[in-house]
Regions:
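An alpha-helical, amphipathic repeat domain used for nucleic-acid recognition
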Residues: 1-184
Length: 184
């Protein structure tokens, strides 16, 4: 079984970045998965476990170097990734908390994620909450006026989605025409 050389890792990184935007941590994770698959195949082919472990260690260091090289070349930009993802998630009705959690899971540093949420093209929390209401057909987008139990359930739904109580109440109390105008 051939070794995983730096050129193969570089080609794998380019192939991934040609199809997907990624953070540096995400690219390292993709390359690590490739190395792990290679190690599993090498073990099944009967290679020496110590040789496999040494090759995995070398390839992991090389993968980190490839990811760093992609950052220096501008092919990977965590700030741009965070801004684009925050804009998309907030526009789809995700709360600030949910967006920050998603970006953290993707490997974006907390300060970059917070800065991305403050971008002028990123919808604010109230707008995102209205989008969530529209998607779930609650609040101003409900078919009928809610009773107290239904309203409490809607508040719970928005709270589980990460919206604060004040924003959720304001969104639920917004008249439908105003909500539609705000989202237009």
């Amino acid at each position: 079984m051939p070794r995983i050389d730096d050129a193969a890792l570089h080609e794998a990184a380019l192939a991934h970045l040609a199809r997907f935007s990624a953070t540096e941590a995400g690219l390292r994770r993709v390359l690590s998965n490739r190395i792990r698959r290679w190690a599993r195949a090498a073990g099944q082919a009967g290679q020496d476990p110590e040789a496999i472990a040494a090759e995995v260690a070398r390839a992991t260091a090389a993968a980190a170097a490839v990811a760093a090289r992609m950052v220096r070349a501008g092919a990977v930009d965590d700030a741009a990734f965070a801004a684009a993802r925050a804009r998309r998630l907030r526009g789809a009705g995700r709360s600030g908390r949910a967006t920050l959690a998603h970006l953290a899971q993707k490997g974006v540093a907390a300060e970059l994620a917070a800065a991305a949420l403050q971008g002028e093209e990123v919808p604010d929390e109230f707008h995102a909450c209205l989008v969530a209401c529209r998607r779930r057909r609650i609040g101003p987008f409900a078919a009928a006026a809610p009773g107290p139990d239904t309203r409490r359930k809607w508040l719970g739904t928005l709270a589980r989605a990460g919206f604060g109580g004040e924003v959720a109440r304001r969104a639920l109390d917004t008249p439908r025409a105003e909500a539609e105008a705000r989202l237009a």
